[in-house]
């Protein structure tokens, strides 16, 4: 009697998929597909396609909104969607998570402030040119002017000197003049004007045109001896050293374009500058290098 009236648990409610899985849909939204007890039918295709379709529609809606806003503001539409979460950088966009190491452009090692030379090169000579704007009779100038000499067999220009500023001028028959020996830019211009005035007083219609400084020469002393042999080996592409021909090392700096004469005693001569700042910059560039080849005897 008990066997006839007893009913197995969940009998009649069993699912054809398996006796352990109830036929009634009791899945919670918090439970993932399949319980691990029995394989579940593939039900993710439609749900995933629906989710993908919804995401695609949202992206299209936001993209169209951005395009309309950018067209109204005159900006280029952006291709980056804020809802896309990824750690990899997208092509053409800024990564969401920047690298902790910021790339830097390789530059020359800067000289520390503690290694500043504290030495200011002194200007020794300035060469300037000026155009007097007229043809000149050099014989007349040499005969009538003071402190002037003219020997056409040796040099085709009148050599004239004045005491203040203590300079020398080369005056050519074409009206061009070269002034040398000044210690500053102001002295060079003043001396050139004095030479032009002398030529005017001799009866020539001299003007003062196109004054220009062509070269500056400076010098200084680093106060320690230098190993020139090691310097020329390390900086072969910039320097040359032939002690049998010239006792100084010739260093041709690229920027600024200055030529330096470096002597073993520590004396340095800088030439080729057009402005004073180039001499100062060149010396500050070469000083740490010279310090690295200091003699320790």
UniProtKB/Swiss-Prot annotation:
Compositionally biased region (Polar residues): 77-87
Start and stop residues of the Sequence repeats: 123-199, 213-290
Pfam families: TBP
GO MF annotation terms: DNA binding; RNA polymerase II general transcription initiation factor activity; RNA polymerase III general transcription initiation factor activity
Cellular component aspect of the GO annotation: nucleus; transcription factor TFIID complex
Keyword terms of this UniProt record: Developmental protein, DNA-binding, Nucleus, Phosphoprotein, Repeat, Transcription, Transcription regulation
UniProt-annotated stretches for the region Disordered: 52-115
PTMs per UniProt: The N-terminal domain is extensively phosphorylated.
UniProt-annotated location(s): Nucleus
Low complexity compositional bias, start-end: 56-76, 104-114
PANTHER family found in the cross-reference section: TATA-BOX BINDING PROTEIN
Subunit structure: Belongs to the TFIID complex together with the TBP-associated factors (TAFs). Binds DNA as monomer.
Family designation: Belongs to the TBP family.
HAMAP family in alphabetical order: TATA_bind_prot_arch
Protein name: TATA-box-binding protein
């Amino acid at each position: 009697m008990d066997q006839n009236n007893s009913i197995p648990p969940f009998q009649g409610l069993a699912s054809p998929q398996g006796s352990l899985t109830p036929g009634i849909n009791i899945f919670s939204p918090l439970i993932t597909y399949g319980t691990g007890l029995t394989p579940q039918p593939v039900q993710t295709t439609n749900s995933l396609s629906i989710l993908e379709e919804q995401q695609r529609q949202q992206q299209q809606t936001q993209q169209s909104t951005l395009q309309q806003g950018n067209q109204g503001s005159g900006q280029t539409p952006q291709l980056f969607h804020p809802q896309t979460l990824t750690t990899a950088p997208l092509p053409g966009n800024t990564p969401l998570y920047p690298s902790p190491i910021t790339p830097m452009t390789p530059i020359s090692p800067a000289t520390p402030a503690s290694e500043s030379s504290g030495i200011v090169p002194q200007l020794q000579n300035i060469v300037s040119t000026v155009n007097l704007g007229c043809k000149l009779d050099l014989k007349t100038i040499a005969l009538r002017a003071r402190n002037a000499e003219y020997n056409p067999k040796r040099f085709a220009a009148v050599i004239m000197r004045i005491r203040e500023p203590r300079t020398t001028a080369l005056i050519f028959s074409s009206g061009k003049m070269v002034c040398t020996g000044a210690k500053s830019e102001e002295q060079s211009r003043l001396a050139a004007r004095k030479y032009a005035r002398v030529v005017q007083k001799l009866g020539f219609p001299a003007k003062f045109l196109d004054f220009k400084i062509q070269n500056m020469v400076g010098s200084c002393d680093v106060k320690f001896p230098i190993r020139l042999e090691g310097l020329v080996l390390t900086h072969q592409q910039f320097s040359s050293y032939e002690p049998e021909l010239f006792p100084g090392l010739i260093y041709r700096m690229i920027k600024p374009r200055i030529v330096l004469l470096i002597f073993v005693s520590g004396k340095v001569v800088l030439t080729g500058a057009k402005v004073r700042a180039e001499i100062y910059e060149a010396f500050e560039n070469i000083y740490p290098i010279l310090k690295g080849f200091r003699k320790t005897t």
